[in-house]
Amino acid sequence: MAKKPQDAQHNQHGKHAQRGQQQKRGSKTQGSRPAHAPAAPVRPWRPGRDKFLPVSRADMDARGWDQCDFVYICGDAYVDHPSFGMAIISRVLDAHGYKVGIICQPDWTDPASITVLGEPRLGFLVSAGNMDSMVNHYSVTKHRRHTDAYTPGGEEGHRPNRAVTVYGNLIRQTFKDAPIIIGGIEASLRRLAHYDYWQDKLKRSVLLDSGADILIYGMGEHAIVEIADALDAGLPVDQITYINGTVYRTGSLDEVYDYDLLPSWDDLTADKLNYARSFNVQQQNMDPITGHRLVEPYPNSVYVVQNPPSATLTTDEMDEVAELPYARDWHPDYDAAGGVPAFAEIKFSISSNRGCFGECSFCALTFHQGRVLQMRSHDSIMREAELLTRDPEFKGYINDVGGPTANFSRPACDKQLKHGVCKNKRCLWPSVCKNMVVDESGYTQLLRDLRQLPGVKKVFVRSGIRFDYTMADASDEFLRELLEHHVSGQLRVAPEHVSDAVLSVMGKPSRAVYDAFCRKFERLNREYGLKQYVVPYLISSHPGSTMKEAVDLAEAVRDMGYMPEQVQDFYPTPSTMSTCMYYTGVDPRTMEPIYVARDPHEKAMQRALIQYRKPENYKLVREALEKAGRRDLIGYTKHCLIRPVPPRPGETSAGGGHGTGKKGGKGHGGAGGAGAKGPKGSKGHGGMSRAQNAAGRNRAAQGRQGANGGGRRS
């Protein structure tokens, strides 16, 4: 793209009910260190503030700037690294000659906080950060989180709920005529009418509620430069309606051509099934080649127009984005607070790709990054790895090389690049498409070359792999390479469930595929004389899961011989297929009814079943088993989940044969499968996988957190 880049995360409420609380939080001084935060270590080699874009008038003066072209307001702290959307967007514009100033986590109760850099010449850019602000702030049970990894010192409370809307309105009140462009995961996934889990209702496009002029959705490298060039040429912002990857509002459709009309706001609020129909049309038009322009009507002759998606990046463009002159650190202003915790997760990790053709129903990536895989070149990745080895804090370990799915290193098929993705077919579900080119050799060679770099001791693969793709590979070279060199005792994969009915709704492969993968993994481990374990990620109360399926999952966990520490209760985040199912009660692809566990108590029971050994879950598990008609699982025999009487202090809730769950206790199995071995000497006798107790990653946020933020899984 000859200097055109960015992660469209610009790359992500009860406002009145929490107003007093928000005002208190908003008044905190950015960069102040909470009592629990460690002091930042002395690191004289860190980049100076001149390596970052301006965050103050003094910084502007040091560069000789009288005025910024753009001021970027973001809900995250300033980390100048390509895993942070704000950094990518601002560096892309900087590379094109635009002057960009940064205001991170302003006090949203004080208009003066967004005036510190003055009014920009061309406009304001706004994003909530690498995560949707509501997902960042609240757990699936709607309890406020106590920490914020994207804030200095990990202290929560420096970002408002629904940050894009709050920031947008604050700018509009302060600079009435300034163009406002919103983007990032929060704006992208709320670009049209969407279900909001936290208020349990349908909400309008965030473009309308934020007061913005243009919304960039998806990965916005192309769009942001086109918008900047148009504004720089003197085009009024209300005339910038032609750029792919953007959403705008209009009062007339007279000059809007070749569009599909979605159900109106009135239709959507009158009947949930209309939302399901609308969502299905939207997800069928997420491809840059085949996607149509979409129009969503609102009352009073207001129309929200979504232009077709922006073109995917070429490999050369991906390289340009990754190799812009990032400082690759948090801003020095955060040193006193101990830095930004999220940076530690990615400092020595490498993003090699974006996009995902896995298309899991509960994941937001299809709606944000698209299904066409975009890959950096081998040479670019190697250059970044060499850069990491020169960091004084590098200890020889590259923590991750991957993306949404690590072992995807090329588009699913050649057809996608010429004709676009299939509208009514998935690449991997219900089985691997016959046209798919399954090739893991490029990624395998990349891992080999990274291992050979001077100073590199080990390269980990933590992004997650798609095991059905690996099983479809005629060669087992990648899996052999993975378990011999790139697994640290545990390989995390995401079967998510064991019920084929639920797996079908999720868009995941059948249990048989997962069991076959586990058998192959164990066979190769025996061949190499290794003791490594598959650690499965599991989701409870996903649409399609009744109490029967939840009990099936609990029995599978019993047969693994260990208790998962990290269990993800289904979180209905904006604009996923699963969230549409949760809200409407139907599968939008077929319009067939689907069971949904909406009641918080039922969701708690389904989750407790997976962790039935925990004493605090005893009552919920017993109630769930009785509701499911499975009293046979209450007793003292080895197949039982719990005993007839509550556990005494120091005991687990588990039924007979499960031991105490402590080191040396006996595990238990029963289901047919690959064979399981519990952790720390516990003994199993069959089950879904060979597994070891592991905390895993916090997966409470939306799928893979949009572009490059947060944990990833496949």
Predicted features along the sequence, with ranges:
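Acidic, low-complexity intrinsically disordered tails
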Residues: 2-43, 419, 425, 642-714
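Conserved SAM/AdoMet-binding glycine-rich loop
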Residues: 65, 72, 88, 103, ...
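N-terminal pre-triad scaffold of radical SAM enzymes
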Residues: 73-78, 335-364, 397
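Glycine-rich beta-alpha loop elements in corrinoid/cobalamin-binding modules
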Residues: 77, 85, 104-299, 306-307
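Terminal amphipathic helices with adjacent charged low-complexity linkers/tails
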Residues: 109, 238-286, 302, 309-313, ...
